[in-house]
Amino acid sequence: RNAALGVSRRDQLFAGLPRLLHRRPWLGALIGWRNRSPLLAQLGERWLGVAASRQLPQPAARPYLPPAIAPVLGERSVFLLVDTFAGLFQPHIAMAAQAVLHAAGYQVHVLRPLADDAEPARPLCCGRTYLSLGQVDAAREEARRLHAALAPALASGAPIVGLEPSCILSLRDDHLKLGLG
């Protein structure tokens, strides 16, 4: 369908929201205004097909930022995969997971894009939002970024902890269908 008709504005917005919020943080404020303004909600319904009566998820004022310095890999190391929803909308979940793992005696290494990634500051994404809206090439690109970041973690033999079940399952299911893994 996307190849024949193109990707709708609505699908571009929802599938690409993690990338858009990273590149244009002011969109978070716009979402808040839309949720509080009946006029903006009506415009959103007309332009994007999002029901005016529905509240959109509000991005956090400050997204999750992993620690600037990662600990040295040790015997009690664990890798934490912070999904884009937790990182951008509910960073307290990622911080709580990190705190629980620290309290359990683990050195927590937050998975990040590799240094040679085209956008090393942009958070990792499993690509499921793209895939769910038929944007297979974009999903494959996100999956490749995630696989590249996972490779050193897998090679270390340390456990990898994910927060969002659908992201973890995308590694097992979707990424294999995309020809990865």
Question: Which positions does each model-derived feature cover?
Answer:
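Iron-sulfur-cluster electron-transfer modules
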Residues: 1-180
